[in-house]
Amino acid sequence: MKKTIFFFSILVFSSFGALTAQNNIKKQTDWITHYPDNINIPFTNSELAKLKMAYGNQLENQILDRPVRVNDVKDIFRNRIIIYQENIKHLTKIPLLSQVPIFTIYNDKISIPVFDKNNFNPLLYNFNFFSKTKQIYRVDNTNFLIVIKPRELK
């Protein structure tokens, strides 16, 4: 009798787990990125130069030969990085750009670049580009803020 109850309980609990796993109503499109139309435009010369600086001789293998990564990088360059000057005094609680490690995985010759608002290369820094929340960094000794917007998901 105990064996019958034991096997019956195993059958019930294993079936319950399978049913709850299959009945997960959560949208399956939560991880699909929505890209604005401007990612259909080819890389500009400036964007290609920034990519070459960050990826060196691994640029084709790591980015250009991978269409999803091409779209991600275009989205980062064109839609997700905002740099502006803030006029308030109390910016000390915002993390500094100098606290972000330099991204040297593919090009170990990269040194800490001097900040230039017009030529800022976000790929030189090890930012978490896949965070679900907005990230803000302050450029050292300035009132410039770098905002990294999260990806837009469908």
Predicted regions and their residues:
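Bacterial Sec-dependent N-terminal signal peptides
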Residues: 1-26
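Short beta-strand and adjacent turn/loop elements
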Residues: 24-154
